[in-house]
Amino acid sequence: MNIRGTPDLGQPSDDPSSGGERERIRQRMKMVIGQLEDILRELKEVAKELREVVSQIDKLTSDFDFELEPDDWTTATVSSTSSSDKAGVGGPFDLGHLDFMTADILSDSWEFCSFLDISTPSDSVDCPESTRPGAGPDYQLMNGGLPVPNGPRVETPDSSSEEAFSAGPVKGQLPQRTPGTRERVRFSDKVLYHALCCDDEEGDGEEEAAEEEGGLSPEPAHTEAPAGPLKPSPAPYKPRRSPLTGRRSGPTSVPEQTRRVTRNSSTQTVSDKSTQTVLPYTATRQKAKGKN
Protein backbone atom coordinates (compact mmCIF):
# COMPACT_ATOMS: atom_id res chain seq x y z
CA MET A 1 0.00 0.00 0.00
CA ASN A 2 1.27 3.49 -0.77
CA ILE A 3 0.56 6.77 1.07
CA ARG A 4 -2.79 7.29 -0.62
CA GLY A 5 -3.91 3.81 0.40
CA THR A 6 -4.00 2.33 -3.14
CA PRO A 7 -2.30 -1.10 -3.70
CA ASP A 8 1.10 -1.12 -5.37
CA LEU A 9 0.89 -2.73 -8.86
CA GLY A 10 4.65 -3.35 -9.19
CA GLN A 11 4.80 -5.97 -6.39
CA PRO A 12 3.22 -9.43 -6.96
CA SER A 13 0.19 -10.12 -4.83
CA ASP A 14 -0.27 -13.50 -3.11
CA ASP A 15 -3.29 -14.97 -4.92
CA PRO A 16 -4.56 -18.28 -3.48
CA SER A 17 -5.86 -19.39 -6.95
CA SER A 18 -2.36 -19.52 -8.47
CA GLY A 19 -1.13 -21.86 -5.75
CA GLY A 20 -4.05 -24.22 -6.39
CA GLU A 21 -3.16 -24.52 -10.08
CA ARG A 22 0.40 -25.48 -9.24
CA GLU A 23 -0.81 -28.18 -6.91
CA ARG A 24 -3.02 -29.58 -9.63
CA ILE A 25 -0.15 -29.74 -12.11
CA ARG A 26 2.05 -31.51 -9.55
CA GLN A 27 -0.65 -34.07 -8.83
CA ARG A 28 -1.12 -34.77 -12.53
CA MET A 29 2.60 -35.23 -13.04
CA LYS A 30 2.75 -37.67 -10.12
CA MET A 31 -0.18 -39.61 -11.58
CA VAL A 32 1.52 -39.88 -15.00
CA ILE A 33 4.76 -41.01 -13.39
CA GLY A 34 2.88 -43.67 -11.44
CA GLN A 35 1.25 -44.94 -14.63
CA LEU A 36 4.62 -45.16 -16.36
CA GLU A 37 6.01 -47.12 -13.43
CA ASP A 38 3.10 -49.55 -13.70
CA ILE A 39 3.79 -49.99 -17.41
CA LEU A 40 7.44 -50.72 -16.73
CA ARG A 41 6.48 -53.33 -14.13
CA GLU A 42 4.17 -55.01 -16.63
CA LEU A 43 6.89 -55.02 -19.27
CA LYS A 44 9.28 -56.66 -16.83
CA GLU A 45 6.69 -59.32 -16.09
CA VAL A 46 6.19 -59.94 -19.82
CA ALA A 47 9.95 -60.28 -20.26
CA LYS A 48 10.06 -62.86 -17.46
CA GLU A 49 7.26 -64.82 -19.10
CA LEU A 50 9.05 -64.73 -22.45
CA ARG A 51 12.20 -66.09 -20.83
CA GLU A 52 10.20 -68.91 -19.30
CA VAL A 53 8.69 -69.74 -22.71
CA VAL A 54 12.15 -69.72 -24.28
CA SER A 55 13.49 -72.07 -21.61
CA GLN A 56 10.60 -74.46 -22.23
CA ILE A 57 11.29 -74.39 -25.96
CA ASP A 58 14.94 -75.16 -25.25
CA LYS A 59 13.93 -78.18 -23.17
CA LEU A 60 11.60 -79.45 -25.89
CA THR A 61 14.13 -79.00 -28.69
CA SER A 62 17.12 -80.37 -26.78
CA ASP A 63 16.47 -83.84 -28.23
CA PHE A 64 16.83 -82.65 -31.84
CA ASP A 65 20.27 -82.80 -33.44
CA PHE A 66 20.82 -79.86 -35.78
CA GLU A 67 23.58 -80.45 -38.36
CA LEU A 68 23.74 -76.83 -39.41
CA GLU A 69 26.57 -74.65 -38.22
CA PRO A 70 25.81 -71.34 -36.43
CA ASP A 71 27.10 -69.45 -39.48
CA ASP A 72 24.63 -71.20 -41.77
CA TRP A 73 21.56 -70.49 -39.66
CA THR A 74 18.79 -68.47 -41.20
CA THR A 75 15.72 -66.81 -39.79
CA ALA A 76 13.75 -70.01 -40.29
CA THR A 77 16.23 -72.28 -38.45
CA VAL A 78 17.51 -69.99 -35.72
CA SER A 79 17.76 -71.96 -32.50
CA SER A 80 16.13 -70.83 -29.26
CA THR A 81 19.47 -70.63 -27.45
CA SER A 82 20.80 -67.91 -29.74
CA SER A 83 17.57 -65.94 -29.43
CA SER A 84 17.64 -66.21 -25.64
CA ASP A 85 21.27 -65.12 -25.50
CA LYS A 86 20.66 -62.09 -27.66
CA ALA A 87 17.45 -61.13 -25.92
CA GLY A 88 19.41 -59.59 -23.07
CA VAL A 89 22.11 -58.01 -25.20
CA GLY A 90 20.34 -56.28 -28.05
CA GLY A 91 16.73 -57.16 -27.45
CA PRO A 92 14.67 -59.88 -29.10
CA PHE A 93 14.42 -57.82 -32.29
CA ASP A 94 18.16 -57.47 -32.87
CA LEU A 95 18.89 -58.52 -36.48
CA GLY A 96 22.53 -57.50 -36.58
CA HIS A 97 23.75 -61.00 -37.45
CA LEU A 98 21.73 -61.15 -40.65
CA ASP A 99 24.05 -60.18 -43.48
CA PHE A 100 21.40 -59.93 -46.16
CA MET A 101 19.73 -56.96 -44.42
CA THR A 102 22.74 -54.67 -44.72
CA ALA A 103 22.73 -51.63 -46.97
CA ASP A 104 25.54 -52.99 -49.15
CA ILE A 105 23.55 -56.00 -50.22
CA LEU A 106 20.52 -53.85 -50.98
CA SER A 107 22.60 -51.50 -53.09
CA ASP A 108 24.11 -54.47 -54.90
CA SER A 109 20.66 -55.77 -55.67
CA TRP A 110 19.67 -52.42 -57.15
CA GLU A 111 22.86 -52.40 -59.20
CA PHE A 112 22.04 -55.90 -60.41
CA CYS A 113 18.59 -54.76 -61.49
CA SER A 114 20.09 -51.84 -63.38
CA PHE A 115 22.61 -54.23 -64.95
CA LEU A 116 19.74 -56.34 -66.22
CA ASP A 117 18.15 -53.26 -67.74
CA ILE A 118 21.40 -52.24 -69.41
CA SER A 119 22.37 -55.70 -70.63
CA THR A 120 19.15 -56.28 -72.51
CA PRO A 121 19.68 -56.63 -76.27
CA SER A 122 19.30 -53.28 -77.93
CA ASP A 123 19.14 -54.44 -81.54
CA SER A 124 15.52 -53.40 -81.83
CA VAL A 125 16.30 -49.94 -80.46
CA ASP A 126 19.15 -49.31 -82.86
CA CYS A 127 18.75 -47.53 -86.14
CA PRO A 128 16.84 -49.42 -88.83
CA GLU A 129 18.64 -51.77 -91.14
CA SER A 130 18.50 -49.41 -94.09
CA THR A 131 20.38 -46.63 -92.25
CA ARG A 132 23.12 -48.77 -90.73
CA PRO A 133 26.52 -48.39 -92.36
CA GLY A 134 27.48 -51.25 -94.57
CA ALA A 135 23.93 -52.55 -94.83
CA GLY A 136 23.00 -53.97 -98.18
CA PRO A 137 21.14 -56.78 -99.86
CA ASP A 138 21.69 -60.28 -98.60
CA TYR A 139 23.48 -61.41 -101.73
CA GLN A 140 26.25 -58.85 -101.09
CA LEU A 141 26.91 -60.26 -97.61
CA MET A 142 27.57 -63.84 -98.72
CA ASN A 143 31.29 -63.35 -99.43
CA GLY A 144 32.19 -61.32 -96.37
CA GLY A 145 30.68 -58.08 -97.61
CA LEU A 146 32.24 -58.24 -101.09
CA PRO A 147 29.90 -57.61 -104.02
CA VAL A 148 28.86 -60.83 -105.73
CA PRO A 149 29.20 -60.68 -109.54
CA ASN A 150 26.22 -62.96 -110.10
CA GLY A 151 23.81 -61.22 -107.74
CA PRO A 152 20.09 -61.21 -108.47
CA ARG A 153 19.22 -58.97 -111.36
CA VAL A 154 16.22 -56.73 -111.26
CA GLU A 155 15.11 -57.84 -114.72
CA THR A 156 14.70 -61.53 -113.85
CA PRO A 157 10.96 -62.27 -113.75
CA ASP A 158 11.41 -65.88 -112.68
CA SER A 159 13.19 -65.13 -109.41
CA SER A 160 11.15 -65.78 -106.29
CA SER A 161 13.12 -63.50 -103.98
CA GLU A 162 11.72 -60.53 -102.12
CA GLU A 163 14.28 -58.20 -103.66
CA ALA A 164 13.07 -58.97 -107.18
CA PHE A 165 9.48 -58.15 -106.30
CA SER A 166 10.28 -55.07 -104.23
CA ALA A 167 12.77 -53.56 -106.70
CA GLY A 168 11.21 -54.92 -109.89
CA PRO A 169 11.11 -53.07 -113.20
CA VAL A 170 8.61 -50.31 -113.75
CA LYS A 171 5.44 -51.10 -115.66
CA GLY A 172 5.94 -50.67 -119.37
CA GLN A 173 9.57 -51.86 -119.36
CA LEU A 174 10.01 -55.33 -120.85
CA PRO A 175 12.64 -57.56 -119.26
CA GLN A 176 15.70 -57.65 -121.49
CA ARG A 177 17.58 -60.91 -121.43
CA THR A 178 19.96 -62.26 -124.04
CA PRO A 179 18.71 -65.62 -125.38
CA GLY A 180 20.79 -68.62 -124.49
CA THR A 181 21.93 -67.34 -121.10
CA ARG A 182 20.90 -69.06 -117.92
CA GLU A 183 21.03 -67.77 -114.39
CA ARG A 184 23.35 -69.41 -111.94
CA VAL A 185 21.59 -70.97 -108.98
CA ARG A 186 22.38 -69.06 -105.77
CA PHE A 187 21.73 -70.11 -102.19
CA SER A 188 21.38 -67.77 -99.27
CA ASP A 189 19.64 -67.61 -95.90
CA LYS A 190 16.75 -65.50 -97.18
CA VAL A 191 17.05 -65.70 -100.97
CA LEU A 192 16.10 -69.04 -102.55
CA TYR A 193 15.89 -69.58 -106.29
CA HIS A 194 14.12 -72.40 -108.06
CA ALA A 195 16.59 -74.88 -109.52
CA LEU A 196 14.53 -75.54 -112.65
CA CYS A 197 14.51 -72.42 -114.80
CA CYS A 198 12.93 -73.36 -118.13
CA ASP A 199 12.30 -69.90 -119.53
CA ASP A 200 15.56 -69.78 -121.47
CA GLU A 201 15.11 -73.27 -122.82
CA GLU A 202 11.63 -72.49 -124.10
CA GLY A 203 12.95 -69.31 -125.70
CA ASP A 204 15.76 -71.25 -127.42
CA GLY A 205 13.35 -73.92 -128.63
CA GLU A 206 10.96 -71.39 -130.09
CA GLU A 207 13.77 -69.53 -131.81
CA GLU A 208 15.19 -72.71 -133.35
CA ALA A 209 11.72 -73.81 -134.42
CA ALA A 210 11.19 -70.47 -136.14
CA GLU A 211 14.54 -70.80 -137.98
CA GLU A 212 13.76 -74.32 -139.18
CA GLU A 213 10.27 -73.33 -140.30
CA GLY A 214 11.77 -70.47 -142.32
CA GLY A 215 13.91 -72.97 -144.29
CA LEU A 216 11.16 -75.56 -144.87
CA SER A 217 8.45 -75.18 -147.45
CA PRO A 218 5.17 -74.01 -145.96
CA GLU A 219 2.61 -76.78 -145.67
CA PRO A 220 -1.07 -76.28 -144.93
CA ALA A 221 -2.09 -77.52 -141.49
CA HIS A 222 -5.42 -79.31 -141.91
CA THR A 223 -6.77 -81.82 -139.47
CA GLU A 224 -9.20 -83.33 -142.00
CA ALA A 225 -9.07 -83.78 -145.77
CA PRO A 226 -11.43 -81.58 -147.77
CA ALA A 227 -14.55 -83.64 -148.40
CA GLY A 228 -16.52 -81.08 -150.42
CA PRO A 229 -15.64 -78.24 -152.72
CA LEU A 230 -12.72 -76.13 -151.74
CA LYS A 231 -13.51 -72.99 -149.80
CA PRO A 232 -12.08 -69.67 -150.92
CA SER A 233 -8.75 -68.82 -149.39
CA PRO A 234 -8.88 -66.53 -146.38
CA ALA A 235 -7.70 -62.94 -146.39
CA PRO A 236 -4.00 -62.44 -147.05
CA TYR A 237 -1.97 -62.81 -143.89
CA LYS A 238 -0.23 -59.69 -142.72
CA PRO A 239 3.39 -60.34 -141.82
CA ARG A 240 4.28 -59.36 -138.28
CA ARG A 241 7.60 -58.98 -136.55
CA SER A 242 8.46 -61.71 -134.07
CA PRO A 243 9.51 -60.40 -130.64
CA LEU A 244 12.15 -63.13 -130.31
CA THR A 245 13.85 -63.37 -133.72
CA GLY A 246 13.32 -59.76 -134.85
CA ARG A 247 12.46 -60.73 -138.49
CA ARG A 248 9.15 -60.86 -140.25
CA SER A 249 7.42 -64.19 -140.15
CA GLY A 250 5.01 -65.27 -142.85
CA PRO A 251 2.17 -67.76 -142.70
CA THR A 252 4.52 -70.24 -141.02
CA SER A 253 3.41 -68.89 -137.61
CA VAL A 254 0.14 -70.84 -137.84
CA PRO A 255 1.75 -74.31 -137.58
CA GLU A 256 4.08 -72.86 -134.96
CA GLN A 257 1.09 -71.98 -132.79
CA THR A 258 -0.39 -75.44 -133.40
CA ARG A 259 2.82 -77.13 -132.36
CA ARG A 260 3.08 -74.93 -129.28
CA VAL A 261 -0.40 -75.97 -128.17
CA THR A 262 0.39 -79.65 -128.63
CA ARG A 263 3.73 -79.23 -126.92
CA ASN A 264 2.27 -77.61 -123.84
CA SER A 265 -0.59 -80.09 -123.58
CA SER A 266 1.63 -83.16 -123.85
CA THR A 267 2.99 -84.78 -120.72
CA GLN A 268 6.75 -84.58 -121.10
CA THR A 269 9.53 -84.06 -118.60
CA VAL A 270 11.72 -80.99 -118.38
CA SER A 271 14.48 -81.46 -120.93
CA ASP A 272 16.51 -79.49 -123.39
CA LYS A 273 14.22 -78.79 -126.32
CA SER A 274 17.16 -78.01 -128.54
CA THR A 275 17.87 -81.77 -128.83
CA GLN A 276 14.34 -82.55 -130.05
CA THR A 277 13.75 -82.85 -133.78
CA VAL A 278 10.97 -80.64 -135.11
CA LEU A 279 8.96 -82.45 -137.82
CA PRO A 280 6.23 -80.86 -139.92
CA TYR A 281 2.72 -82.02 -139.14
CA THR A 282 0.93 -83.98 -141.86
CA ALA A 283 -2.56 -85.37 -141.71
CA THR A 284 -3.10 -89.15 -141.90
CA ARG A 285 -5.34 -88.96 -144.95
CA GLN A 286 -2.82 -86.82 -146.81
CA LYS A 287 -0.15 -89.45 -146.14
CA ALA A 288 -2.45 -92.12 -147.56
CA LYS A 289 -3.12 -90.08 -150.70
CA GLY A 290 0.59 -89.48 -151.16
CA LYS A 291 1.26 -93.21 -151.11
CA ASN A 292 -1.42 -93.86 -153.73
UniProtKB/Swiss-Prot annotation:
Superkingdom of origin:
Eukaryota
- Which chain positions lie within coiled-coil regions? 23-63
Give the Acidic residues compositional bias ranges: 198-214
Where in the sequence does UniProt note compositional bias of the Polar residues kind?
Answer: 263-285
Enumerate the UniProt keywords alphabetically: Coiled coil, Synapse
Coarse class of the protein's main subcellular location? other
Output the InterPro entries linked to this UniProt entry.
Answer: Largen/INSYN1
Question: One short Pfam family name for this protein?
Answer: DUF4589
Which positions carry the signal peptide feature in this UniProt record? none
Instruction: Give GO terms for biological process.
Output: inhibitory postsynaptic potential
Cellular component aspect of the GO annotation: postsynaptic density
Cellular localisation: Postsynaptic density
Specify where the region named Disordered lies, as residue ranges.
1-25, 122-186, 198-292
As for family, the record states: Belongs to the INSYN1 family.
* Free-text function comment from the UniProt entry: Component of the protein machinery at the inhibitory synapses, probably acting as a scaffold. Inhibitory synapses dampen neuronal activity through postsynaptic hyperpolarization. This synaptic inhibition is fundamental for the functioning of the central nervous system, shaping and orchestrating the flow of information through neuronal networks to generate a precise neural code.
The UniProt subunit note reads as follows: Interacts with GPHN.
Protein name per UniProt: Inhibitory synaptic factor 1
Organism annotation = Bos taurus (Bovine)
Q: What is the lineage of its organism?
A: Eukaryota, Metazoa, Chordata, Craniata, Vertebrata
Encoding gene, per UniProt annotation: INSYN1
